[in-house]
Amino acid sequence: MSECQFDHVVVIGYGVVTGEVLKTVYSLASKYGYTYEYIEHEVHPFNAAKKLAEAEGIPYNILQDKKDLTRYFEELLMKKTLIISASNNYLFPEKIVSSENIVIINFHNALLPELPGRNAPSWSIYEGKDYTGITWHYVTEGVDEGDIIVQKKCDVTADIRAYELVSKQMRLAGEAFDECYESVLMNHATRKKQVIEKGRKIYKSYEIPGNGCFNLDDSPKEIYKLLRALDYGKNNIFPPARTKKNGIDIQIRRYRSMIMMKDKIAYIFHLIMKIN
């Protein structure tokens, strides 16, 4: 049996990448001799990790209340525990983060130290970045400040929408986790310190690119960028983009780039609008 530094592994989060992480944790448990469990904090109807837990008999808990979740983690303080935070919005309190027995790693959907905080794919698009990526990093008291374990890069293409970029990043995150997980278990993972600029911006969940609004006389390129940054398909991460026409508030329900002229930055849009 390979030498493992942990007695227990906890996976917390939801969605595609969490399911991939849990699958890897489950498949390697007998090799490394740890116990494991899955925690669902934010309940989602199509949760791949929960489905896997139910299908394979993996122990899992639903702890939606933050105080209950914190108490649950406090009960683990006497046990050598690895917590894997994947697509998880719970902020671990200082008592948990600073415990000698607890190690936490987290998936972030940007190339840290860039774009720390929430909804990084949207900000990658809105800020016009040519590329972004994913980061697995150790968790410290500061938001997204811990040492980097592994990163993978992907392009932010001219027509990509937020939900499409997220899909790319989920795939990369699963690949990266498989590459680094065993080294994390054995405490052999390469650690790269982040260079944190003083006063760097941390994006909050309530912040919306462009405040979710545009003017019809804005450049088509800027309008298209905003629309793509807010577009999570059927997931209502942000409210629909808004504009005004003849003094009337309008919501953009659907949009399409119909023409992009060859040597000019020019777009013609087909916008389906709902007048409030």
Where are these regions (language model features)?
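One-carbon transfer enzymes
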Residues: 1-238, 243, 248-250, 254-275
